[in-house]
Amino acid sequence: MTTATMRAASVPSFGARLDVAEQPVPTPGPGQALVRVLTTGVCHTDLHAVEGDWPVKPSPPFIPGHEGVGLVEAVGEGVTNVAVGDLVGNAWLWSACGHCEHCRTGWETLCEQQQNGGYSVDGSFAEYMLVDAEYAAVVPAGSDPVEVAPVLCAGVTVYKGLKVTGVRPGQWVVISGIGGLGHIAVQYAVAMGMRVAAVDIADDKLALAKKHGAEVTVNALDEDPVEAIQRQTGGSHGVLVTAVHPSAFGQAIGMTRRGGTIVFNGLPPGDFPAPIFDIVLKGLTIRGSIVGTRQDMIEALDFYARGLIHPTVAERQLDDVNEVLDEMRAGKIDGRIVLRLATA
């Protein structure tokens, strides 16, 4: 009997070029579904996975990717909530235990037993992937598989981060870093009724933020971003840091008005200086936020389905994956890159 194969891009060792080659198509186990991948976004987390530069590392060889969109082709034993032909996606939160304190209280993204797509389990840089049927994202019918792919990580991540800031309609939020996450964060913030100030070091990215509804834009190379934000907004009610440079994290404290909340989405290496006196005197809250729960995913995709979110994407092919990662290392990507693997 001939084993079915698929093309996949796998990481043979940390820092190596991805190997695009034939591999066996996986078989869905109990509770799992086999998905024929149409598209997959390329996330900065994928680059960290390839480099192996986070404290918790994947185990090579593995297939990256956690923004995959595709059609269910087969289901394993006990699967009832997705069916053959459904349009679904994988996500960073591939599965969780469902029983711990965090899972029981709606914070499954903090589950210590969670599995992560394209990291601890093989992901979507392949023609086929497995999903846990209980945690797979159900993609709204009629979605553009290319455009919707980044919502599965970048979108849900910034959406949850904005929720955590507690910023209300009519209040100011700073989006620090207008890259793959930040340009989508601007759109969610506007759709949620927030007033947006965007901070970056590239004029073209600030122009993109302006296009998506930012009222204030600040180039941190041309002027002091803390002074500029305080002058133009009176201090932001919240700051969402999606940037990948540690300096942005310290600057966020100075941008925030008294009683405000700073949320970190970006994950650069290293530490940042935190002025204890200012944090205490201003009554600031500093929080981390990682991706989103299944309910957050439903809500984030609903914004897309209603036409409120349009990620800026460029379409490439699986064979381009190493070049795409090189462009990501060099900071040359505007918006998000989405790899096309098949058509519906």
Which ranges hold each PLM region?
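Glycine-rich beta-strand-centered segment in the early N-terminal region that forms part
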Residues: 26-40, 53-101, 140-143
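Cytochrome P450 core scaffold surrounding the K-helix E-X-X-R motif
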Residues: 45-51
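NAD(P)H dinucleotide-binding glycine-rich loop of Rossmann-like/cofactor-binding domains
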Residues: 95-176
